[in-house]
């Protein structure tokens, strides 16, 4: 994807669509943004005439003087935020691709709640790139999707002095979006492809690309070293467990952050077998591990001034003649013993070994990322995640 930054107006011509935003009104949009759109009365009449009101992510495509304009709803003006700008860009990018456009112009609009141009530019590029994400690796595109590919996104700033800021912000957004896409590809991959060994190989490739230190401890050595939590979960699978450590250590780093990721590449529940309905979704149980890999990619690419350690316990949780059973007692890496009552509570077992291993780095902060319990979905639905911490300052920073 090519990303350009222009002043005043973006490119025009065949295959180009200009995107504007609109604040929601009662019967018609309250106001178009940016200022150039708000001052275009003819465009305003065309948009209102199409029955468009400006509700969040509502779209309308109108032609005017040989050009195409895609207007996306921002909702009420009082609710404007960078997240709304991000959603606008994602909605616009998907709509533009679906309609066969090759290039899209996104305005870096000036509205008081949004702050400086750099923050707006980053939100727009993040939204556009993440909105365009599709997992196409294992599917044949249907005819109506073939050949439809957005090639260029142009950020249009109002003042020349904003070019440098917007360009740097767009680059950062691109790095973040690439890391998220890496994680999404791993999460979406089927479990017969994304095995524990596959995750280990991904970590090795990332380490080679970004000059990270990578350590992979195989199953046989985990048994000898006393990783009882991971070994107990892994012993029922034909795919050997992998304990993965990635280290990003910049010069003069004074702080150390550790991220532990649950990497259950398929969770059948083990002997305490899950219901058949939606069991295919249990390939997602390695989402924490995928997120850790994406986090290390971002840290190293952006050259963050802190040490970042990623720790991943990658295994399957399967029923077999060698699987752990309810009533078994395991000795974890910390030396504590655990009685297994339900083998489908495997997440806390593998994470206990990860977290104890993390202590050797004497971290300033530890974050574990895991699809640990369906109770979170019951309580919070798909709109929020569960976050637990004793450190209120850390919670506030993570919520940003």
Where are the regions that the model predicts?
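Short amphipathic alpha-helical segment within the helicase RecA-like ATPase core
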Residues: 1-263
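A generic structural signal for tightly packed, nonpolar segments enriched in small/aliphatic residues
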Residues: 57, 183, 200-400
